[in-house]
Amino acid sequence: MKNIAVTVDNLCIKYRGLKKTSIRASWSRLRDKVEVFEALKNVSFELEEGKILGIIGKNGSGKSTMLKAIAGVFSPDSGTIDLHNNSISLLSIGVGFNRKLTGKENIYLSGMLLGFDEEQIKEKEKEIIDFADIGDFINRPVKTYSSGMYSKLAFAITAILETDIMLIDEVLSVGDAKFKEKSYNKMKELITDDKRTVIIVSHNLTTIKNLCDEVLWLNDGEVIEIGKPEVIIPKYEKFMNE
């Protein structure tokens, strides 16, 4: 019997912001009202150890919010997330790097945040740098990087410093064609480990179909359906084309 790697139970996350008021209301000194947006609404699922879950949905459906909640970046307003004592890493553009530090310094910072000690990171440093393949930029501040270079380094760190659970947000589609192929092949290599659990967010349905064991379809923060890619993806495509 497989162990459970991730349990999400009735997860709700809300964003709060100031609602815009009219000029007349401003002149009347009426208070701005707080507008609440429900990003995730009572989301529940379990993912077995070693399984690959793809999350699909239109823009704004809550996919990235889901990953950040599982990673601990966002706290639930209600509901629970249980990682069952597994280590976890989030690979997402704009998350995790100190932009003032060099790429090499960020390798160590990211590694330590993932729970690795300096010696363990040192052993993997050359492999990470070679995989990222960003040349002399590895010694320059991350703030000088293009989005493609950022993605290459982020993917290299997450893929080489292997955690129990990997969360991947759209980065398989970033970078030049050569790196896309390299990262895709690395993902296929990683998921052959029946102990590693992966959750992928992507608009590339071919990637989801080829890599994932199951697909979770989100729409406006709610789970529409969870099932096999060959069942869920045709339904989603029909929905998007209506």
Write out the residue ranges for each language-model feature.
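Pre-NBD coupling/linker segments of ABC/ABC-like ATPases
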Residues: 2-38, 230-242
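Conserved ABC ATPase "signature" region
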Residues: 27, 108, 120-137
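H-loop/switch region of ABC-family ATPase nucleotide-binding domains
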Residues: 202-203
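A short, surface-exposed alpha-helical micro-motif characterized by mixed small hydrophobic
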Residues: 208-210
